[in-house]
Amino acid sequence: MQNAPESVLNALVPMVVEQTAKGERSYDIYSRLLKERVIFLVGQVEEHMANLIVAQLLFLESESPDKDIYLYINSPGGSVTAGMAIYDTMQFIKPNVSTVCIGQAASMGAFLLAGGAKGKRHCLPNSRVMIHQPLGGFQGQASDIAIHAQEILGIKNKLNQMLADHTGQPLEVIERDTDRDNFMSATEAAEYGLVDSVLDKRG
């Protein structure tokens, strides 16, 4: 049974009706856009959302392995492991994944934005991008806390190296710039190498 907020949200999703040879067929707007190879990554990056994004990427690859996929991102970030599941799938599949920031791409959202196919990563003009180091918190015995601290440091180093590879920035610059929350405009994100261009009109 759906809870109240979920049922209200579903009621707000527009439906699209198409005429077919067999009569009318209705889709929710996201399913209709999926037919056009458009995926929306909206909200917190977490395991359930990651599974849905991964499934859509794999489905579109099976449909047409040589056609680009368009991933629209409006996210404050979230789980590193969930984000890496999406990132690894983006790199694994045959189609190029073009990323587009609408609204904001922060933290893991910014990482996924930068992880799109080279030359096909974009921001809309008034979007915002934010990069920083991974966050973590753990309670328990001192030895366990030390283990988790070591894990977070390892993740931080790995993400910094991957961002350096995607942006073309030196690793030491990435390490400095992700030490604290680092906000950028669309133009600044393009200059930094997180995206390739700022789009104000569809080409």
Curated annotation (Swiss-Prot):
One of its GO terms (cellular component) is endopeptidase Clp complex. Keywords: Cytoplasm, Hydrolase, Protease, Serine protease. InterPro entries: ClpP (IPR001907), ClpP/crotonase-like_dom_sf (IPR029045), ClpP/TepA (IPR023562), ClpP_His_AS (IPR033135), ClpP_Ser_AS (IPR018215). It is found in: Cytoplasm. Pfam families: CLP_protease (PF00574). Its EC number is 3.4.21.92. It catalyses: Hydrolysis of proteins to small peptides in the presence of ATP and magnesium. alpha-casein is the usual test substrate. In the absence of ATP, only oligopeptides shorter than five residues are hydrolyzed (such as succinyl-Leu-Tyr-|-NHMec, and Leu-Tyr-Leu-|-Tyr-Trp, in which cleavage of the -Tyr-|-Leu- and -Tyr-|-Trp bonds also occurs). The active site is at 107 (nucleophile), 132. Cleaves peptides in various proteins in a process that requires ATP hydrolysis. Has a chymotrypsin-like activity. Plays a major role in the degradation of misfolded proteins. NCBIfam families: clpP (TIGR00493), PRK00277.1 (NF001368), PRK12553.1 (NF009205). This is ATP-dependent Clp protease proteolytic subunit. The gene is clpP.
